[in-house]
Amino acid sequence: MQLFVRAQELHTLEVTGQETVAQIKDHVASLEGIAPEDQVVLLAGSPLEDEATLGQCGVEALTTLEVAGRMLGGKVHGSLARAGKVRGQTPKVAKQEKKKKKTGRAKRRMQYNRRFVNVVPTFGKKKGPNANS
C-alpha cells in the first residue's frame, strides 16, 4: 500500500503494513537527513510509538503521516513567562474593617459640633471648609 510522509518535503512510500514506526523513521532519516531520535511521527495529530507497527496504529492505504522535528524546550519567551508573577509574589494581607459611618441624628450632631461648638475664633475673613489656607 502507498503511504505519504510529510516531513520537510512530501514523500511517497510503498509499505506492507507490517513495518514499525522506527523503520519509517530510519527511512525518513535517509531521505531528509533528520536523526531518528529527533523525529516525532504523527498520525492525525497524535504521536506514534516506535515499537508499534503501522497496522496496529490504524494506518491505511493513502494515509499521510507527518514527521515533526523534536524541539528543545524549557524556556518560555515573552509575556507568558510573566503571567501571574506579580500576583503570586504579593503576600496576602487581611482586609481591615472600616468603622461604620454614622447616619441620621448622630451624623447631624457631629456636623453641628464641628461647625458651631468646636470653632476656634480666628482673625480676618471666615473661610469655607474646603479653603486652602
Curated annotation (Swiss-Prot):
Coiled coil (residue ranges): none
Chain positions with N6-succinyllysine modification: 125
A Pfam entry, by short name: ubiquitin
GO BP annotation list: antibacterial humoral response; antimicrobial humoral immune response mediated by antimicrobial peptide; cytoplasmic translation; defense response to Gram-positive bacterium; innate immune response in mucosa
Keywords in alphabetical order: Cytoplasm, Nucleus, Ribonucleoprotein, Ribosomal protein
Gene Ontology terms for molecular function: structural constituent of ribosome
Record-linked CDD domains: Ubl_FUBI
Compositionally biased region (Basic residues): 97-110
Top-rank lineage group of the source organism: Eukaryota
Keyword Cytoplasm among record annotations: yes
SUPFAM superfamilies: Ubiquitin-like
GO cellular component: cytoplasm; cytosolic small ribosomal subunit; extracellular space; nucleus
Miscellaneous field: FAU encodes a fusion protein consisting of the ubiquitin-like protein FUBI at the N terminus and ribosomal protein S30 at the C terminus.
PANTHER family named in the record: 40S RIBOSOMAL PROTEIN S30/UBIQUITIN-LIKE PROTEIN FUBI, RIBOSOMAL PROTEIN S30, ISOFORM A
Family classification: In the N-terminal section; belongs to the ubiquitin family.
Protein name (record): Ubiquitin-like FUBI-ribosomal protein eS30 fusion protein
Gene encoding the protein: Fau
